[in-house]
Structures are given as structure tokens and as C-alpha cells.
């Protein structure tokens, strides 16, 4: 096709990203083609987006740096892989695969497993007071059982506590950011039990069906030129999922062009409003619901609550009770409507009674509670993706951009490759699956 006499120039329509740029240019060079080529850069497969893309084809030279970055990545992978794999295979007398990304990720799981194996649980005790004012207050953790039992006996003997301090702080949680691929994969693993690869496959299929924008993005913001069309997209998204109640839309919360690289954050498209969502496979439908819910939440208002801490004294020991009152549901209203059946059931926080400082309060009962410290948790795909995303962040100098290990589009591939090599795998069922090192890993 490149060498046909009726072809004057070529349009690079490969994936709009670093690896897509590399794939095209490797084919172009291998074919020995010298004809000029331009770049089609798309973030959506909708017809209007494709037409706009062809109307604004970019010179290929604008993407030379992207190609060079991909070429460096490819050669670094090859040099590390072929040299280190041969070295360690010879040293240990068996085939061992070493990779620029796979090996550090495997090391994370090995270090975590070692910490779990070496962990020795420690017992601790607390004394809980049931106050007649209507709340439960707990002591600090006590390592010695005798000391805890002595405190319990003293409290049962005294049966009176004095309210020392009551503090009330109003707090808020801002709406979550829009999804990039990694954040979507983490939530899909945590809420749906999907592996990172399953989520990527579902998202890719939705993209090809023109129901979401480009999935392999590492941005969680939108560009300024998208602000005008966003309210309409929010309305269409709410309508597609029968969530049509009017609510304040704060577009500027998700607009920041300086934080958009190759692609903006993941979004549903306007085509979704006309699609038969019930006909989608269940996995795709659930991933689409996550992406849509995140859009509706991201433009919402803060979740506001008041947190009250009560400190009381009994038998010379401090006891603490905490309570929480929701002042405004904000974006959590939309989250509950869109994802209610997927969200984990959390214990409702206690509402503390209205009490005054320095007043005495009777103790209705006192009880000894026993617990023990917990080992570090096994990685799940959710927490492993987060560890990859934030790798070495603590040791990086201030002001240095933190990139982590791997890219959103290939992080799941490294875990899958380690599994195929017999170096790691998942244990457990569905959402509780842990990632652990196996065999040679």
C-alpha cells in the first residue's frame, strides 16, 4: 500500500500514544518508504471526533520526540532483558527472566511476602465504657492484660466519668478526580473483582464501540476547550442511567490543560445516550457504569460532615469516643445512586450526644476487649497498581515529576507476564484475591 503509485502521502492512524507512534514508524522504516506522512490523533472513535481529527492532521515532526521516547523504552527493555536474563540464568543454572519493569514489581511482592512471614502479632487490650449519655468510649491500647484488668476493676468500682473535652470539627471530601486507566483498573478490581487486564479489555471494547474515549490515558483532567460541551455530556450520561435529577455542575473542577499529556481523562461519549446498554456484556456494562459514575461525581459538590471527639476521665484514665454527622452528601449522593449495590457496606458512624465539658456522666457498664496487631496485607491488583504508580515517590527530590513503574496501558501486562513465567499469581476469590510471589519468584 505504501509503495502504490497512486499513494502520494500517508496518514499515521495508529493508537494515539507513544507505542502507537513507534509501531507506525517501525513499519514505515521496514517498508523503506520515503513518502511524507502526517499524524491523525484521536481520543474518541465517534464520527464527529474522527472528522475533526482528519480536518486537523498534524505534521509528523511534532511527534518525533514521542517516537524517540518509545524507541528508548524498547531498546532499554531489550538491553536489560537479553543481558540480565542471560547473566542470571548462567549464574543460577536455570532459565530466569529479568525485565526492566517486571523484576521491580516482582521484588515488591517478595518484600511484602517476607514482611508478612516475619510478622509476629502482638496482643493488646482496651477497656470500653458504656456511658449513660448514650455513647461508648474506649481507652488507649494496653499491652499487659493485668494492667487492663486492673483498670477495668477500677472503672467498675468508680462508675462515674468526667467529660474533659469535646471538640467538633467540620471537614469535607472533595469530589474524586476523573479516571485514568490505572484508577479505573484499581476500582474495577476493588468493586468488581476484575483483573487489570480484564478491565483494559472491557475498556478497549467500549472504545471500539464508541461508548468511551481513549482508555490508555494517564491523565485525570480535561482541556479548557472541552468545558463548554461538558454540561451536555453530564446530562446525557445521567439520562442514560436514569439519574436525571438536577444537581449543581462544577465544570472547572475537572479542567486543567497543563495536566493533560497525550490524552485527556476517561469519559463516556455522547453516543452512549443512544446505545442499547442492556445489550452489552455484563463486564463492559459494569466498567461503563464506573466511568459514567465517576464523571457525575467529579463535577459534584464536596461531601461535608462534622466530626466530634469526646474525651472523658474515669479511674484516672482517658477514654475517647468519636462521632460523625453528615452535613451535606454532595458527590456521594450520585455515587450511591450509580454504584449503590457495588459499594461496600460500612458501619454507620455513631452520633455523639450533646454533652458539656466538666460534667459528670454515669458509667452504665465496662468491658474488656482483646485484639491483636495485624500483619501487612497481601497485595491485591488494586494495591499493586497503586504501588507501581507511586514507586520511589518518597525518595524523589521535591519538584521532580513522579512517574512510577510502567505505563497505564501496560502495567497489567507485567503482572500477567510474571504469572505466565510462574513467578507470581493470585490467591483467593474474586475481590479478595491477593497477589503473591510463586516458585522462582
PLM segments and residue spans:
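Toprim catalytic domain recognition across nucleic-acid enzymes
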Residues: 1-392, 396-423, 428-433, 440
